[in-house]
Amino acid sequence: NNAGKLTYGPLLEYGWGNYTSHLDSGIRADGNTKYYGIGMIVRQDNNSGLYYEGSVRYGRMDADYASGDMIGAGGSKVYADYDSSSSYYGAHVGIGRVSKLNDTVKADIYAKLLYTHQSGDSVILGGAGNGEVYDFDAVNSTRARLGARLSKENGERGTYYAGLAYEYEFDGEAKATVKGLSTPAPSIKGSSGMLELGYIIQNKDVNAPAVDIGFQGWSGKKQGFSGNINFIWKF
């Protein structure tokens, strides 16, 4: 278009990971998650370097949970576990500006607002709590992210990048009930910092397929490491 370049298309996503949660009551739990979904993404890059983008997505998440810190009827710690499966949907909008610092280095300053809704589920507890039913409420996550990324072209082979971001979670509380009583509710509400490093494999043709390999480290309310591999085709 006259203002720049409009890019849009479908997306497929799949991911997996593991987690550890700590409640104020002293209960520690560990688990694994995986998700898979579809969506749509759109981005407008203006000739001035300004860009804005958005996406919507829908999918399903499977998770398991295990803890040896649950309190049994006798007051001592017991082991319990469960499996869960529920749908999710989400969306994001963002705005930023890419500035060319020299022939091979660019700076990207951006702001994003991200929203995710994960549906509730009822699970049957295994282990010492065998047979008890836990009803999980839906979880809503609304996050604001401000960040910057530097990228450097690596000749004809691709682009290195590194970035920093600040993220604030406005919600993210996971509530549940058992026998009509509320359980301790973990929450990721609060501030987190993110450091990212990555490499995009792509030749000089801007419409050529690309592979984006990235790693992220988190500190603050969210702690840990994550990675991603994105396959991008433009036509």
Report residues per predicted region.
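Outer membrane beta-barrel transmembrane domains
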Residues: G39, L101, N130-F235
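Short hydrophobic/aromatic-rich motifs at helix boundaries and adjacent loops
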Residues: P10-E13, G120, Y199-Q202
